[in-house]
């Protein structure tokens, strides 16, 4: 499996992978602890480069154990050189990710794609999404 467990960012308490996002001990946020040995054995630049032109090109690095089924065609948006802004900020090589090319014109499409598929893995039948309105 790609994911070992969930771990609290505050107290380091570990949990089995489940639909939890807050530590029961200290209410700190939980994050994914990856199984890097498994990932190293199952990923290659060649495999990534042959993948679909979407977020799913990086499926081996995402916290999903099953193949994706809910696909919004998000991700794989271009990097755009911001020469003038870079000069203004004193940066020689500034690039900006243009996520306005995602289905709802937002970076949030990536998160929703992964979360929707993870909810399906957990056999959830209802999914709600809080947003500021651009999702």
What are the language-model segments listed below?
Residues 1-135:
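PLP-dependent amino-acid enzyme catalytic core
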């Amino acid at each position: 499996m790609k994911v070992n467990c969930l771990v609290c960012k505050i107290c380091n308490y570990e949990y089995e992978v489940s639909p939890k996002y807050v530590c029961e001990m200290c209410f700190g946020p939980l994050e994914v602890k990856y199984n890097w040995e498994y990932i190293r054995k199952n990923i290659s630049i060649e495999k990534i480069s042959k993948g679909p032109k979407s977020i799913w090109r990086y499926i081996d690095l995402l916290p999903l154990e099953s193949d994706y089924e809910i696909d919004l065609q998000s991700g794989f948006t271009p990097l755009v050189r911001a020469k003038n802004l870079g000069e203004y900020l004193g940066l020689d090589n500034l690039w900006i990710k243009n996520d306005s090319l995602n289905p709802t014109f937002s970076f949030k499409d990536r998160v929703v794609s992964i979360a929707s598929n993870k909810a399906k893995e957990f056999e959830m039948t209802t999914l709600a999404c809080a947003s500021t309105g651009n999702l």
